[in-house]
Regions:
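Cytosolic-side transmembrane-helix boundaries in multi-pass membrane proteins
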Residues: 313, 324-325, 374, 381, ...
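Single transmembrane alpha-helix segments in multi-pass membrane proteins
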Residues: 202-246, 279, 283-293, 432-435
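Helix-loop-helix "hairpin" substructures at the membrane interface of multi-pass membrane proteins
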Residues: 336-414, 443
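Membrane-embedded helix boundary and interhelical linker motif in transport proteins
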Residues: 233-279, 458
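Extended repeat-based scaffolds of very large eukaryotic assembly and lipid-transport proteins
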Residues: 1-165, 169-197
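Alpha-helical transmembrane segments within multi-pass membrane transporters and channels
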Residues: 257-303, 309, 443-448, 479-480
Length: 493
């Protein structure tokens, strides 16, 4: 008998599905069939686990013609351990995890030896985690009070939120001394979980803030340079995301299944979105200098064109496959995880900020860009080719949005109007931080992200957004120019 058939036989014996026929043949019964006038059960071979046949057809028989195979209490306990050992040795980690979960919370003590043996052999991190929890739960039924208290401490140290309820419910069935330890460990674990949840809220705020900063950096450059409220900036993000999707489709055609497409798509997302930004400036905005209302309406029209074009080409919903390196996350505790994809976005934003700061403050292009932002006419008189600076700035702003779109494929679907979710918040970041101010953009973006995620656990998302907008309005009443006041042409006008 092979291992799979042996494991199935043990489970059948444990569940009372092994019987004898009138001729004394040992069989395993399947589910009852009530389609006829009386119930019948199919029979299986206990050795091979395959269906038995009689006359070339599946053998079915009335349950009344079968006799039970008696299994005593001690034998049933041995069967539980043996069955658990078979289930816990399954080659599939997901099956092993499911097997452990089936023993929780009340069956762990009956199969504790099998759980301990499985823990000593387990290599998979996820399965080891739940095995440790199951062993600690099983040891709560230890024969001595010392063993029970030690198990409670280990259970609390593992950090699983379900242990709080478990310890408090078990406190009523033990001695007062042990119950005191149970309650103390439950309170200790609850406080730890609350603290870790606050850390997770801060992390979520930093993650949202990083996305807003990544989108708003390009918007701040364009708005600070040309004074244009670019309503198509969210669509630059969408262009970067769809470029990633196209690269994935091309790779799946010639090299299916790999993750290299994601990294290859990075420069193409930046270049494509940057070129769309240059095209927008050349075709539309250069004709509308110092006409802010017309510029706003024109960019809004361009955004509608880009959205409908994407919808016509790709449909309403597409998705980009997440690279295997970004699956899972860093576990602060059993119930608190920091996803790798969002950690990557935070790191990406930090790197992008460093590169942008270098471009703006350590290169001739940055010097000319800042000069044009401060005073376009004087810069032109000094020989700066302002039209060329405009093109490069729009390429940089669009490229940063394309970079954000590339990163956004890690945390959401790719849809034609995906930029709408961030364009308003990005404008809030730019205005609150100060027009064209990189440091202000970072502070405002992170602040808005943290406040948004901090309000969500207390208020609903909609009410949290209303409160956030109210706070920004009050702040702008005190500092109309934002955290850092702009200088140059924007201030003069």
């Amino acid at each position: 008998m092979g291992k799979p058939a042996y494991a199935k036989f043990l489970l059948s014996l444990h569940d009372g599905d092994v019987h004898k026929t009138s001729s004394g043949k040992l069989v395993v019964t399947g589910e009852e069939d009530w389609s006829g006038s009386s119930p019948v059960v199919p029979l299986e071979d206990p050795v091979t686990g395959s269906p038995l046949e009689q006359g070339g057809v599946p053998w079915t028989i009335s349950p009344d013609s079968l006799s039970d195979l008696p299994v005593g209490r001690e034998d049933r306990a041995l069967l539980e351990t043996a069955s658990a050992g078979q289930a816990l040795s399954d080659p599939d980690p997901a099956a092993r995890r499911t097997a452990v979960e089936s023993f929780l919370p009340d069956g762990a003590s009956s199969v504790l030896p099998a759980l301990r043996e499985a823990l000593s052999k387990e290599a998979n991190k996820s399965v080891r985690k739940i095995l440790k929890y199951a062993v600690a739960v099983g040891e709560l039924d230890a024969a001595t009070d010392t063993g029970k208290m030690s198990a409670a401490v280990r259970l609390s140290d593992l950090g699983d939120a379900s242990a709080v309820t478990l310890l408090r419910s078990r406190a009523a069935a033990v001695s007062p001394e042990v119950a005191k330890v149970y309650r103390h460990q439950a309170d200790r674990l609850e406080q730890r979980i609350k603290f870790l949840e606050k850390i997770q809220v801060v992390f979520s705020g930093l993650s949202l803030g990083s996305i807003l900063v990544l989108v708003a950096m390009g918007l701040a450059i364009i708005y600070g340079l040309a004074g244009v409220i670019n309503m198509a900036h969210g669509e630059f993000l969408m262009v970067g995301a769809y470029t990633t999707y196209v690269v994935q489709s091309l790779f799946d055609r010639w090299h299916p299944g790999g993750d290299a497409f994601f990294w290859v798509a990075l420069p193409f997302s930046i270049l494509t979105a940057g070129c769309v930004g240059v095209l927008l400036d050349w075709a539309v905005l250069r004709h509308l200098h110092k006409r802010p209302l017309e510029s706003l309406l024109a960019t809004w029209g361009v955004s509608l064109i880009l959205v409908q074009t994407a919808r016509s080409l790709f449909g309403d919903l597409t998705s980009v496959r997440q690279p295997a390196i970004f699956t899972g996350g860093y576990d602060l505790a059993a119930s608190v995880t920091l996803p790798w994809n969002r950690l990557f976005i935070i790191v990406l934003t930090t790197v992008a900020l460093g590169v942008l700061a270098y471009l703006l403050y350590r290169t001739r292009f940055g010097l000319r860009l800042r000069a044009v932002v401060q005073n376009r006419d004087m810069s032109a008189c000094l020989g700066v080719r302002t039209a060329r600076v405009d093109r490069m700035a729009f390429f940089l702003g669009g490229g940063l949005a394309g970079l954000a779109g590339w990163a956004m494929t890690l945390v959401g679907n790719v849809v034609p109007n995906m930029g709408d979710s961030y364009i308003v918040d990005s404008f809030l970041v730019v205005v609150t931080g100060g027009v064209g101010k990189l440091a202000g953009t970072v502070i405002a973006g992170m602040g808005i992200g943290l406040v948004t995620k901090g309000l969500e656990p207390v208020f609903e998302a909609v009410y949290g957004k209303v409160i956030l907008l109210g706070l920004i309005i009050l702040f702008l009443q005190v500092r109309p120019t934002g955290i850092f006041a702009p200088r140059g042409r924007g201030e003069d006008t």
